[in-house]
Amino acid sequence: MRRSLRLASFWHARRWLAATLCAGALLAQQPTVFRANVNLVRVVATVKTLAGQTVGTLGKDEFEVYDNGVQQQVAVFEHQTEQALSVVLMVDTSGSTAKELKYEADSSSRFFHALLGEGNLEDSAALFTFNWEIREQQPFTRDLKALDARLKLMHGEAGTAMYDAVYLGARRLEPRQGRKVIVVVTDGGDTVSKFTVHQALEAAQLADAVIYAIVVMPITNDAGRNTGGEHALDFMASGTGGRCFLPSVGTELDKAFTSIITELRTQYLLGFYPKDVPLNKDRFHKLEVRVTRPDLRVSARNGYYGEVEGGRGGSPEDRVTVSPDRQLKKKR
């Protein structure tokens, strides 16, 4: 009896080995690599009419999501009013913005009060300032008095490390749950960053953060206007599903903040598990979100960093590092 069990196990093992080798040979003949990823990919989407009005009443079946050109099944669908917000407000305090800081502080205060005065009780905001260095003036909180106190201490000096600010703000957001948003208030120019605009965008996409940019008091004469900085802000905003407001002069800053809050209250969360997605040597997966109604337009991030052919690919730290003199500094 014991010998018959050993023989049965032997022939079972041979059949298993033959099937495994056969499957391996078939896989080796396939030129394209596909993988079913167990990691949920989250996409925040904003939908508007052709006239620019936000639409927050669509159903799951009215969305289509494509990963590297392959349509995916939407596994998670939520209206964003139920999702907690973590908002990083990045205020440019370089020398070129000094004259506008008082108005920016007042408008930012109104933004914080409107943001945290309604919505999810777990919503929180943090205040960062940036010139040649980035300072965390106020960590994530719901304490409006603490935020207002820090806003009043802002003063302008030195250069502008805008890309470094976005990168480090994204790193602060990465471990947090729920929706993540970076709002950048600046005059659009970057003069001293160690990171590039592409590295800043990559950090935001890795953190699942949406970027909104508000350009304050741009020069109306194109000959002296920093259009390169404005284009970079628009590049980062559109790549994460956000918006860039141009220009923002006087009361238009308040209008921009109001528009941001309106969008945040009417967004959708779409989630999918990547399936049958062709992999290549680039970690970046191209995303496309569509709505079935031709009279509507959708904004969402244009991609995410996932698996590559042959494995997961390197860590973000393999491509981007923080140099010692650009470390984020906390306000004491």
What does each model-identified segment do?
Residues R2-T20:
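Bacterial N-terminal signal peptides that target proteins for export
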Residues A28-R332:
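Scaffold/interface architecture of coatomer-like assemblies
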Residues A19-A28:
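Hydrophobic h-region of N-terminal signal peptides that target proteins for export
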